[in-house]
């Protein structure tokens, strides 16, 4: 039953407005001869999948209304009596039925990104005992760490096209289950030999590569513009909390059960998420039969038109300077971010002389700071937009913080000898970096909402190239140079990105 509500009344004329066929029996004709009843009876039935709200309203002669409402789930019925208004909207649904569906989608995307980084950073910790067991040198470690990005690079644009044409639900679901299987297979591949491990890590990148374009496609359809920064900040904070969770639990699991346990336990969580995703999510509000009319109207009034994409206007997209600003700044941003993501535990272990457990636990703080800062930045950005600041200025302010903050704090690492201050500097660097979620990471939906998946695929391809080159280059730099050289390159790219972003970016829609 697709109708949201069914209205029945003892007034025969109202039957013709309730989607019921006219009654032609003799019993119905006899109803017209009945004297008006002093009480009017109305019934609303609200079907919600396997549950319903059933309410009977009775109006007395003094025009007050009493009611008895029932919540039905399976064979269980519960009810209550009260006095209500003359509107179906006064029906009180259980809290889990009233929770905005768009935020259910956001939370599911958040949890997917939580798993994404849990499965990605576990290698950053496990690589330490694995290197000792298999005798890998820093160059080999850099090769293993960068192999993830080989597959990740392949599916950025393809994932965006796929999401924009067939819907983000299928694409994100595919990505999560694919990378979860690859995670589980990692210990087996490592035992078989280095080539097998490189292939499995690349396969894992294939799955994670479609996640960001698919998520961007889904949220561009579900989230109103005034909630865009907050929703994206929450989803991306899932990545940071995934790093926190992975870095915190990996040392414990390795210590108790050995390094393979990290991959088996983290990878198995993907099946739990997939079950919830398939039952609760839809690619678009138009495909969701359980969406309440009020929320459907809110989304329709405040989201860009999302007609099905049949072809991608590549020439138009690539002719726009703000698109190239987005692509180049994504490269500048991700160089430093991915180096810290993959090499931070090694930095703590080699430079700051922390043991395995300490390296994992202390690596948590920068990512925890990012999770907090990303959500704070999202709230600040949406507040500024609601108070009349242009989207362009808000995006430039937030991304400038996201570039200059990390540049400043990474520069300070050269002058710090205290391990405590080094960890604090790293946390501040990552915390200011998180303001980028309300800058360049929100900009795809600003400038090309219909093609946001493809556009994110384009810019993130540049970001992944930065990850591949930066992660592999760091291994070679450390064989012949120092960590100061690694950080200097990152700072230089942050400064270049700041200039490009403030000269060429915009928050206005430039592609319909």
From Swiss-Prot:
Membrane topology qualifier: Multi-pass membrane protein
GO biological process: one example: sodium ion transport
InterPro entries hit by this protein: MFS, MFS_dom, MFS_Na/Anion_cotransporter, MFS_trans_sf, SLC17A9-like
Keywords: Chloroplast, Ion transport, Membrane, Plastid, Sodium, Sodium transport, Symport, Thylakoid, Transit peptide, Transmembrane, Transmembrane helix, Transport
pH dependence (UniProt free text): Optimum pH is 7.5.
Gene3D superfamilies: MFS general substrate transporter like domains
Listed transmembrane segments: 103-123, 141-161, 171-191, 192-212, 234-254, 257-277, 323-343, 361-381, 401-421, 453-473, 486-506
Entry's localization field: Plastid, Chloroplast thylakoid membrane
GO molecular-function term, one example from the UniProt record: phosphate transmembrane transporter activity
CDD domains attached to this UniProt entry: MFS_SLC17A9_like (cd17380)
PROSITE patterns for this protein: MFS
Description of what induces expression: Expressed with a circadian rhythm showing a peak during the middle of the day (under long day conditions).
UniProt cross-references to Pfam families, sorted A to Z: MFS_1
Tissues expressed in: Expressed in flower buds, sepals of mature flowers and mature leaves, less in senescent leaves and at low levels in roots.
Primary site of residence: plastid
GO cellular component: chloroplast thylakoid membrane; thylakoid
Boundaries of the annotated transit peptide in chain numbering: 1-59
Function: Specific for inorganic phosphate transport across the thylakoid membrane in a sodium dependent manner. Binds glutamate but cannot transport it. May act as an ascorbate transporter at the thylakoid membrane.
Family, per entry: Belongs to the major facilitator superfamily. Sodium/anion cotransporter (TC 2.A.1.14) family.
Protein name: Sodium-dependent phosphate transport protein 1, chloroplastic
Gene name as annotated: ANTR1
